A protein has these predicted regions:
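N-terminal glycine-rich phosphate-binding loop and ensuing alpha1 helix
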Residues: 2-74
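Conserved N-terminal catalytic core of the sugar/cofactor nucleotidyltransferase
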Residues: 49-117, 201
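Short aromatic/hydrophobic "clamp" motif used to bind/position activated sugar donors
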Residues: 120-121
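Hydrophobic helical membrane-anchoring modules
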Residues: 230-249
Length: 249
């Protein structure tokens, strides 16, 4: 099938949990501290650029849209031209993000021109260890089912709790075989992602991820196997683990 694959990377967050260890050059230029976790250096390269390189290396991917804070767009474009020439072999658009992830994705979708059966992947800016194999499996599952995510089985026992005046009390144990830990990319046929975002906006609904919007709109979301290494780098401990992964690769 001759379908286009579009990648959306929401990267407008501040990442306050990472701020104690943020290092590297600001996308706005200079060395002043900032808390944008996606620009944190990982072995000398910003996490966001590492993530973009993975998607740029997947032949099926045709276009990449990155949502950024308005004051970071010009600086990041300059960094891409300097450090990401292989990324720019794809069509790359930098768009202004929103206050929340969902708005950042919506802003990127507003800039996209696609047919109903094209595939849109949404991926966390700070998951630089995603593999081409995972990406392609999500593409295929999204094309078949309309909506798909990468996920990994839960390892720890999961408890459901009730909040009471006495504190959090366990109400039940959720069987682990019924639980997956959601990752990205999360993929959708274009007609599906447009519909779920339009419905969420009309109702003022804010979801925790794109799959939650699809669930709310009545879609069954397929799950493909992700990887324990496909971590989201949001804390100093995550950054240390990422550095270990690079050294052990």
């Amino acid at each position: 099938m001759n379908r286009k694959v579009i990648v959306v990377i929401p990267a407008a967050g501040l990442g306050t949990r990472m701020s104690p260890v943020v290092r590297g050059e600001s996308p706005r230029g200079g060395k002043k501290p900032r808390a944008s976790k996606q620009f944190t250096d990982l072995a000398g390269t910003p996490i966001l650029i590492r993530t973009l390189r993975i998607f740029a290396g997947v032949p099926e991917v045709g276009e990449i849209y990155v949502s950024l804070r308005k004051d970071e767009i010009a600086g990041f474009r300059a960094r891409l031209e300097k450090e990401g020439k292989e990324i720019l072999k794809k069509k790359v658009e930098l768009v202004e993000g929103g206050e929340h992830r969902q708005q950042s994705v919506a802003n990127a979708l507003a800039a996209v021109s696609a047919d109903k059966d094209d595939i849109v992947l949404v991926h966390d800016a700070v998951r630089p260890f995603v593999t081409p194999e995972i990406i392609n499996e999500v593409i295929d599952a999204a094309g078949k089912h309309g909506a798909a995510i990468a996920g990994v089985p839960a390892i720890d026992t999961v408890k459901q709790v009730e909040r009471t005046a006495e504190g959090a009390l366990i109400s039940s144990t959720i069987p682990r075989e019924r639980v997956v830990m959601a990752q990205t990319p999360q993929g959708f046929r274009y007609e599906v992602i447009r519909k779920i975002f339009d419905e969420a906006a009309a109702d003022g609904f804010m979801g925790t991820d794109e799959a939650s919007l699809a669930e709310r709109s009545g879609y069954k979301v397929s799950v493909v196997m992700g990887s324990p290494r496909n971590i989201k780098i949001t804390t100093p401990a995550d950054l240390q683990l990422a550095e270990f992964y690079l050294k052990s690769a």
